[in-house]
Every structure is written in structure tokens, then in C-alpha cells.
């Protein structure tokens, strides 16, 4: 936050994005298929957007399967391959494998309120355990970010 502290609304949105990022990270594992991963992350995001009052259950009930309601506030993908190129190309129809590196970068953008929050981690898939977070030493909890901004 530019002023050193998040407003109450910014804090609520930040925490929602952080929860989505954390849940999305746990879903990345060898054998997972891209479309299933993105569908599951979409469910988590939908729940958070309902909690923030940005969507309601009627929006979700009336959504078209090809254009989920959450896309109004989260219009990009959650993850992409990471390699030699910034947005490295990878096979989207084959299962994820151990050793692959992915971004995890959900965001919520609220133009009518004049702000958005996007968080990103880069992770390496491992068998039988959560992905290894290459950015694990960077402050990401809201309180840590505010503390750093006020140091």
C-alpha cells in the first residue's frame, strides 16, 4: 500500500487473493490437468468474491460455463509455465509433472473501486509434497507487507 497501510476494503481483498493463491498452490501436483486446476481455482475465487460482496449466488447460478461470473474480477489465468521465456509455453493437455515450474498469480481487480490486488509465487512441482515455493522468503502476509512499507 502506498500509504503504508491497507484500507479495510483493500485488506479484505488482499486477504482473499492470498487465500486463493495459497489454495491454488496446494492444488498444483504431478498428474493434475490444467483445465481441472483452473476450474477448481475458479471455485475458490468465486467463493471469495461472494464473501467480498462482488458476486452473489444468483450471479453464479446464471453464469455461462464458458464465461464464469468470477471472470468479471479475475480475467486472467491463475498459472502458467515458467522457463526460459517470461510466459513459457507448455503442454496444456498433458498432466503436470514433477520438476515443472509454474507461476501462481491470482488477482482481484475492482475498477469501480479504483484498485486491484495481484499476488504471485513461482513454484516447482514435487511428488508427494506441496510445491517448492521459489519466493518463500519474500514477505506476502498482509501484516508483513505493511510492516515492510512502514520500516
Which residue stretches match the model-derived regions?
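Active-site neighborhoods and metal-handling regions in enzymes and metal-associated proteins
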Residues: 1-151
